[in-house]
Amino acid sequence: MLTILGFSMVTVFTILIMTKKVSPIVALTITPIVFALIGGFGKGIGDMILEGIQTVASSAALLLFAILFFGILIDAGLFDPLIEKILSIVKGDPVKIAIGSAVLAMLIALDGDGTTTYMITVSAMLPLYKRIGMNPMVMATLAMLSLSIVSGMTPWGGPATRAISVLGLDPSDFFVPLLPTMLGGIACVIFLAFLMGRKERNRIGIVQLEPRHITKDSSQSYMAATLESEQLKRPRLIYLNLFLVISIMVFIVLGTKHPSVLFLIGFVLALTINYPNVKMQKERIAEHSGNAITVVLLVFSAGVFAGILSGTKMVDAIAGSLISIIPSSMGGFFPVIVALTSIPFTFVLSNDAYYFGMVPIFAEAASAYGIEPVEIARASIMGQPVHLMSPLVASTVLLVSMLKMDLGSFQRFAVKWAVITSLVITLLAIITGAITIL
C-alpha cells in the first residue's frame, strides 16, 4: 500500500512539475500533504512538515546569504577588471576567445544563477564572435558547461542545493570531498574550449583587430547586461573584496564554521564595506532579495516534501521495492549507477522532479548497501552538463533566444561535449573518492 502510494505521489508530483500546472513550491507542498491525507496520516502531518523544515533550515540560510554575498560583490564590480582583461587578451584568436568565454562564464556562475551567467557572458562576448565570424554555438556550449560545473557542484548552486536540502546533509560534507572533481571539471571545460577554439581557428584563422575595436561593443553590451550604474562600482575596494571572497572560500574548505555562518558574515562585511550608506544598503538588499527568497522558499518546500515522504515511511517502501530488483552483487556500484543514470534522467526531468522526487528514493535504497546519502547526492549532480541542454531549463531557453538560434540545433551541437563532460567528472569523482565503489 505504501509503495503504491509513494510511487503515485512521486508520479503526480513529476507530472505537475513537467506540465507546469503549478509552481514547484506549490507542487512540493500540496502533493505530499494530499497523499499523506489519503494514506491516513492526517494527525502527524504537522510534525512531519516541521521536522522536514528543520532539516533544511541550514541549507536555506546558506543559499540566502550566498546569493546576497555574490550579488553585492558583482554590484561592486569585483569581477569587472577580469572581464575587461579577458576581452583585451583574447583579441582575434578563436582559441583565446573560446577559453575566455569559458573562464568568464565560470566566474559569473559563482552566484549560482544561470540567467545571470548567460546574460553577462553573451553580452560581453557575442560582439567578438560576430566580428570575427566564430560560431556562437561554441560560446553557448561553453557557457552551459561552465555553469554545469560551477553552479552544479557548489553548495549554493541549484542542483546541489536541492540534493543537500532534500537529504538533510551538511553542505561542507557534500562539497569539500567534491572540490577536486570540480577543479578537474573546470580543467576539462577549458580543454574542450581549446579544442572548439582550435577548430574555429582552422576554419577562419586569426583575425587582426584594433584593440579599441575589440572591447568597444563588448564593454557597452556588458554594461547593458549588468544594468548597474557607475555609482555602485567600487574599484578602489577591489582588493579588499577579493580578499574577502578568498577568505570565505578558504574557511569553507577548512570547515571552521558552517558555510551559512560564513556567508552571513561575508555578506554583512561586503555590504558594510561597499555601501556604508543605509539607504544604499536597503536598495542592494531589495535588488537581490527577490531571487534569494524564491530559492529559500523552494528549499523549505522541499523540506515539506522530504519530511512527509520520510515521516510516512513511503520512501522506505519505495526503496525496498527498488532493492528487491537490484542484484546484491551490484549494490556496491549504486553510486556509479546513480551518476550514470542521472545523465538521461535529468534531461527528461526537471531538477525539481529529479532531486525532490527520485534522489530521496535512491538514497534510501543505497543505505541498504551501507552507502551514505551524501554519496548519492554527489553522484546525482554528474548529469548536470546534459541536463542544461533540456528545454525544461528556463535559462537555456533564454540562452538560445539571446543568440537567435534553434534549440534543436544547439542540442545537436552541444550533446557530444556535454556527455563527455559528464563522463569525465563521474570518472574524476570515482578516482578522488567523492563517490565510491564498495
From Swiss-Prot:
A GO molecular function held by the record: transmembrane transporter activity
Its membrane topology: Multi-pass membrane protein
Gene Ontology CC, one term: plasma membrane
Keyword field: Cell membrane, Citrate utilization, Membrane, Symport, Transmembrane, Transmembrane helix, Transport
Residues in the signal sequence: none
Segments traversing the membrane: 22-42, 59-79, 89-109, 137-157, 174-194, 237-257, 258-278, 292-312, 330-350, 356-376, 380-400, 418-438
Protein name according to UniProt: Uncharacterized transporter YraO
Organism: Bacillus subtilis (strain 168)
